[in-house]
Curated annotation (Swiss-Prot):
GO cellular component, one term: cytoplasm
Source organism superkingdom: Bacteria
Pfam families membership: Ribosomal_S9 (PF00380)
GO molecular function: RNA binding; structural constituent of ribosome
Similarity annotation: Belongs to the universal ribosomal protein uS9 family.
Species: Chlorobium phaeovibrioides (strain DSM 265 / 1930)
PROSITE patterns: RIBOSOMAL_S9
Record's keyword terms, sorted: Ribonucleoprotein, Ribosomal protein
Stated name of the protein: Small ribosomal subunit protein uS9
GO biological process: translation
Presence of keyword Lipid biosynthesis: no
Length: 129
């Protein structure tokens, strides 16, 4: 096994780079503990879900650099990057992650605004007369 495993995860416009080393289970995101960085408990749980499902919360130290997008996109990007790193270390976790769709990049992006409209799909008010 390599000393440091680095992977990339993306979601919406967020990009997360994960550096995973054998350790005691510390997760540092942008130089802050994960619980401190994701103040919302749900977003923190989404980001660390692969570790819980693989039952490896105490086996690795994880350092994450994440930028772009908002908190929701960033937590999804971190989750994908951690899942990819764990899949690299142990092939048996792939079977656990596949049904949960943790190794799949979510393709949904914001739809662009069209000209002649208020938003992507919302039109200006229409008057017959």
């Amino acid at each position: 096994m390599k000393e440091v495993i680095d992977t990339v995860g993306r979601r919406k416009t967020s990009v997360a780079r994960v550096f995973m080393t054998p350790g005691k289970g510390r997760v540092i995101i942008n130089k802050l503990p994960a619980e401190e960085y994701f103040k919302d408990e749900v977003k923190c749980r989404v980001a660390l879900r692969p570790l819980v499902l693989a039952e490896k919360t105490e086996d690795f130290d994880i350092k994450v650099n994440v930028h772009g997008g908002g908190i929701s996109g960033q937590s999804g990007a971190v989750s994908l990057a951690i899942a990819r790193a764990l899949a690299e270390t142990d092939d048996s976790v792939r079977a656990v992650f596949k049904p949960e769709r943790l190794l799949t990049r979510d393709p949904r992006m914001v739809e662009r605004k069209k000209f002649g409209r208020k938003k992507a799909r919302k039109s200006f008010q229409f008057s017959k007369r």
